[in-house]
């Protein structure tokens, strides 16, 4: 009987500590949610320029832009001066943590610079109605969330009765996903994910990237931002994307972020960011001739592939 009491007490005590741990985790989540709700709204959402020209891309300019994340001891980006011409295809490259994604977020207004100004069509983006400004951009980010709705609703971001199905098919085809969708029982009307629907479809990481790319194309905004859009693609799918890049970016300003330097050679201009600053810029060939950091990184990646190819041939 004594042993039963001790065992029961130990189990009861263990459950208490487990519940306290769960309560602490829930409390942290609640505090995080509260801090989000209490975060001051700095964006201009109630007034401002409500009709920025979105029929064609305009000039984008960053003047002395710096950004430091809240609580950080140093700036992620420092004194960035950059002008992007209408319809220009820009590549942003650099090592991990260089500030590439932060720069993309600044361009589309997800965050405002700590210092400096960003202009779209000669107007400081803070003067735009922020919701109207967001409509100028189609973006594919590394971090994303997809709602459990139909594939058609994901791509079009609208209700089924408002979907342009011909346009959606073209976008899915260029993104390399139409053959997959066509084989599904309900096609674009298939529910995505099994969070709510047991018969929902699930995609691989590469297929999700294609889906997000199709969504960005469907929006047909004048500026397209692609942050590592090929990170989860297999080599064949990646090659197909590069072959279709001109079709994807036709008459648009595009900003292509990648750590694979061979994938940026088709861009008009390449911006190399190092330690939060622009250290080199130019075309692929121009940067190779400079014998700088870009060339060193490019040759390092090329050497890796050559060495692996040599090992494969020896093994055979």
Segments and roles (model prediction):
Residues 34-91, 170, 247-250:
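Primarily ABC-family ATPase nucleotide-binding module
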Residues 117-119, 134, 152-198, 242-243, ...:
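ABC ATPase nucleotide-binding domain helical subdomain, centered on the C-loop/LSGGQ "ABC signature"
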Residues 224-228:
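Catalytic Walker B motif of ABC-type/P-loop ATPase nucleotide-binding domains
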Residues 178-211, 220, 304-316:
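ABC-fold ATPase nucleotide-binding domain signature/coupling loops
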Residues 187, 243, 265-316:
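C-terminal portion of ABC ATPase nucleotide-binding domains
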């Amino acid at each position: 009987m004594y042993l039963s009491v001790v065992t029961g007490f130990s189990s009861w005590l263990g459950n208490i500590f487990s519940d306290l741990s769960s309560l602490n985790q829930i409390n942290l989540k609640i505090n995080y949610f509260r801090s989000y709700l209490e975060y001051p709204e700095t964006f201009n959402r109630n007034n401002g320029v409500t009709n920025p020209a979105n029929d064609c891309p305009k000039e984008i300019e960053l003047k002395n832009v710096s950004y430091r994340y809240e609580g950080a001891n140093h700036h992620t980006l420092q004194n960035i001066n950059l002008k992007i011409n209408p319809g220009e295809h820009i590549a942003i490259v650099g090592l991990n943590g260089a500030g590439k994604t932060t720069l993309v977020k600044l361009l589309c207004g997800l965050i405002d610079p700590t210092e400096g100004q960003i202009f779209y069509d000669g107007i400081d983006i803070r003067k735009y109605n922020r919701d109207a400004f967001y409509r100028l951009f189609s973006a594919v980010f590394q971090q994303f969330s997809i709602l459990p709705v139909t594939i058609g609703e994901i791509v079009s971001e609208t209700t089924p009765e408002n979907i342009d199905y011909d346009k959606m098919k073209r976008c899915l085809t260029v993104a390399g996903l139409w053959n997959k969708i066509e084989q599904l029982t309900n096609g674009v009307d298939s529910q995505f994910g099994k969070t709510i629907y047991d018969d929902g479809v699930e995609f691989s990481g590469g297929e999700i990237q294609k889906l997000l790319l199709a969504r960005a194309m469907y929006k047909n905004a004048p500026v397209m931002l692609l942050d590592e859009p090929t990170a989860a693609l297999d080599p064949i799918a990646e090659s197909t994307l590069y072959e279709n890049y001109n079709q994807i970016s036709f008459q648009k300003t595009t900003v292509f972020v990648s750590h694979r330097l061979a994938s940026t050679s088709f861009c008009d201009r390449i911006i190399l960011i190092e330690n939060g600053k622009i250290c080199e810029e130019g075309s692929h060939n121009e940067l190779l001739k400079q014998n700088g950091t870009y060339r060193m990184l490019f040759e390092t990646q090329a050497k890796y592939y050559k060495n692996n190819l040599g090992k494969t041939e020896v093994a055979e």
